């Protein structure tokens, strides 16, 4: 603009001095090439302006693209974060599922071990029955044959259970190996593992029922064996002979009624005088979880424990447990249950064990 203003007096106004002599300092403007130079300069300025505008527009577009790209990156980050969170939850759920499966397998393994122990006890009792069968006196050949046949059947059933338990142990081992490979398995394979565990649990329950039936048969065999051995022995029928005494397991009554029942049979409630007596009673009651009255009682906690014959209790064999310090109007009486002697109110109902001397002359 300043350059054009300087040009106005030269182009538009008459210069009085131009007639006589050339003006000083403006000899360049009066040359013939300044006009093309100005046009060229104006074009360059215009081109630069257009270039700047185009570049600014491109910069804005690039900025918008960068913002859109940044938004896409943020959205992808959120998606990736959600996917990672979902994957982590799935892994946690898988770990929890595997932990539950392992706990179930540990529980089943423990149950199998318990059943194996019970089976060993049954086998030992069966062996004792076989030995007692050989020592049975004055038993008829037919009775012995029937008992032996029943024992053979019991052995066969026990062997069958043993084989099935081995199969269950093998299945359990296979489940444990499958659990170690659970990370490679899909949800379908885990469902199959759970179904196998459910099937194994059902089989265990069935075997438990069968063992309970075998226990009952074993008890019946013991009672039948004792009856066969005592049919003409030193004890009356249905009584169990051991050393110098005969024993009878009687129905459930309170302590006083049980004592009267034993007296009516010319006997008394159980009295333990030796360690051998205690071991015999513990073995005879091991098959049952029911309580059995003994001939031991006292009127109140300040009185000593006395047997029916008036002799005091010797604590070298056992000690009583339970509420022995509590006072009852009917007194406190002792019963044996699960190999432990307890003290309780005499008015309660329990089974009883009658005891009397054996007629050893019949064995000579």
Curated annotation (Swiss-Prot):
N-glycosylated. GO terms for biological process: immune system process; inflammatory response; leukocyte cell-cell adhesion; lipoprotein metabolic process; negative regulation of miRNA transcription; positive regulation of superoxide anion generation; response to hydrogen peroxide; vasoconstriction. Disulfide bonds join 235-246, 262-354, 333-346. Induction: By hypertension. Up-regulated by shear stress, lipopolysaccharide and TNF-alpha in cultured vascular endothelial cells. Residues 1-21 are annotated as: Disordered. CDD domains: CLECT_NK_receptors_like. GO terms for cellular component: extracellular region; membrane raft; plasma membrane; receptor complex. The chain crosses the membrane at residues 32-54. Residues 1-31 are cytoplasmic. It is a lipid-anchor; Single-pass type II membrane protein. Predominantly expressed in lung and at lower level in kidney. Expressed in macrophages but not in vascular smooth muscle cells. Pfam families: Lectin_C. Residues 83-233 form a coiled coil. Residues 55-364 are extracellular. The cytoplasmic region is required for subcellular sorting on the cell surface. The C-type lectin domain mediates the recognition and binding of oxLDL. This is Oxidized low-density lipoprotein receptor 1. It comes from Rattus norvegicus.
């Amino acid at each position: 603009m300043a350059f054009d203003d300087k040009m106005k007096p030269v182009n538009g106004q008459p210069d009085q001095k131009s007639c006589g002599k050339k003006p000083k300092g403006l000899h360049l403007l009066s040359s013939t090439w300044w006009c093309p130079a100005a046009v060229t300069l104006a074009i360059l300025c215009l081109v630069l302006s257009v270039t700047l505008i185009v570049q600014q527009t491109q910069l804005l577009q690039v900025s918008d693209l960068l913002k859109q790209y940044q938004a896409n990156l943020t959205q992808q980050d959120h998606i990736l974060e959600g996917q990672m969170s979902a994957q982590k939850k799935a892994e946690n759920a898988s770990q929890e599922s595997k932990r539950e499966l392992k706990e179930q397998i540990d529980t089943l393994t423990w149950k199998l071990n318990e059943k194996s122990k019970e089976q060993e006890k049954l086998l030992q009792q069966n062996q004792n029955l076989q030995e007692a069968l050989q020592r049975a006196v004055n038993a008829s050949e037919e009775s012995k044959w029937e008992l032996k046949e029943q024992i053979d059947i019991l052995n066969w059933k026990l062997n069958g259970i043993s084989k099935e338990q081995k199969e269950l142990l093998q299945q359990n081992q296979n489940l444990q190996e499958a659990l170690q490979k659970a990370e490679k398995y899909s949800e379908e394979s885990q469902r199959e593992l759970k179904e196998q565990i459910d099937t194994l649990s059902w089989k265990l329950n069935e075997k438990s029922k069968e063992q309970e039936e075998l226990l009952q048969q074993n008890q019946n065999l013991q009672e039948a064996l004792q009856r066969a051995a005592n049919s003409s022995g030193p004890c009356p029928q249905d009584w169990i002979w051991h050393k110098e005494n005969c024993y009878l397991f009687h129905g459930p009554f309170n302590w006083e009624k049980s004592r009267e029942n034993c007296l009516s049979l010319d006997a008394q409630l159980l009295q333990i005088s030796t360690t051998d007596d205690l071991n015999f009673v513990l073995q005879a009651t091991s098959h049952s979880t029911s309580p059995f009255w003994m001939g031991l009682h006292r009127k109140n906690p300040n009185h000593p424990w006395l047997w029916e014959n008036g002799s005091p209790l010797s604590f070298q064999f056992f000690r009583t447990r339970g509420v022995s310090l509590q006072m009852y109007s009917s007194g406190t009486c002792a019963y044996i249950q699960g190999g432990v002697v307890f003290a309780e109110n005499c008015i309660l109902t329990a089974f009883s064990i009658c005891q009397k001397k054996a007629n050893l002359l019949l064995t000579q």
